[in-house]
């Protein structure tokens, strides 16, 4: 592997972050800086932690630690998506959870 971009998990996380970002822009205006900001940050954190872990892959414990962080960010993102799904009628949310 030459780059983190060769990792399937990174590409999946990157695509999720893009979809979540676009979906978040459909939230009511008053939520763009609250719920919208939080879900954008948590979705981007997934891919960022994968990249940081890849950068430390020489140290197995560090690599694993950042993958655990990525998983935790994924769970946070899913929780945010479930909340948005309950509160608002945005059809793209159902496709993400």
Region spans (language model):
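Amphipathic alpha-helical assembly/interaction segments
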Residues: 1-97
